Every structure is written in C-alpha cells, then in structure tokens.
Swiss-Prot record:
Belongs to the UPF0178 family. This is UPF0178 protein OB0454. The lineage of its organism: Bacteria, Bacillati, Bacillota, Bacilli, Bacillales. It holds the Pfam family DUF188.
Length: 146
C-alpha cells in the first residue's frame, strides 16, 4: 500500500506524513511546479512535480496508483477515476469517496458549474475546521492500519 496525495491544495499533508511514517508507509506528494519547495520531508515521503496544467497532478497520480493504494484529494473527478481503479479515496474533510456517494458528488459539481456558467454565484467550500482535521486523522488511521 502507498499513499498518493493531490498535494497542491491539501491542508492535511502534515497528518498524512506523520501517521504514515508511524506505519512505515510510503507517501508520494504530487504537486505542480508552481508549488515548488525546498522543504525537506522524511525519507518515506517523495515529492513529484508536474506541469502546471489543470489536471496534470491527477493524470500522474492515476499513472502511479495501483489497486489498494490510498489517494487523498478534494477533486471529485480524480476520486471517480481512482475508485474505478480499486483505490481507496479520502477527502481532507474526513470522509471517504465510495461508489455510493461519488455520483451524487459529481452531479453536485456539474450543477454548480452550470449555475456559474449562467452567471449565478455559488458558494465555495467551507473553511477547514479543527473537527475536520480530527475526522480526517481518524479516517486516515482506519485505512492505513487495515
């Protein structure tokens, strides 16, 4: 099992790195070159930089991931592809994407995009709370200790 992180806007990288290190699980952070950093991570963490294109990180994660790996993303499209590949997919707010909830999430995304295209404003995501971080930590631990 490996953990792949859609890392450009992931607010729980610290939790992922800490908890996976305790379990000796490899983590790959996939991020765009626009987020290049000299920050050093522990030896179980690899950072892969991709072009700044809209879905470049998603494509790279799908290229690397195998059935049974964990992917952390807030991107519903990537989540859908990863589920079809047999990966476990987690959102940083502490819920797992499943074959039971992904269609509703994709439909919601589509309707919001349709409203924005017609000139309406839609609400953005709520800010990450401490409760969200706790929920993610608990969920992540469940998956890496299976």
């Amino acid at each position: 099992m490996k953990v792949y992180v859609d890392a450009d806007a992931c607010p729980v990288k610290d939790i992922i790195i800490k908890e996976s290190g305790k379990q000796n699980i490899a983590v790959t952070l996939v991020t765009s070159l626009s987020h290049y950093s000299l920050h050093e991570h522990p030896s179980h963490v690899e950072t892969i930089y991709v072009d700044t294109g809209a879905d470049a990180a998603d494509y790279r994660i799908m290229q690397l991931a195998n059935k049974g790996d964990i992917i952390v993303t807030q991107d519903y499209g990537l989540a859908s592809l990863a589920l079809a590949k047999g990966c476990y997919v987690l959102h940083h707010k502490g819920f797992a994407y499943t074959n039971h909830n992904i269609d509703q999430l994709l439909q919601s995304r589509y309707l919001s995009a349709k409203e924005r295209k017609s000139g309406k404003r839609t609400k953005g995501p709520k800010a990450l709370t401490e409760e969200d971080r706790i929920n993610f930590n608990q969920l992540f631990l469940q998956y890496i200790t299976k």
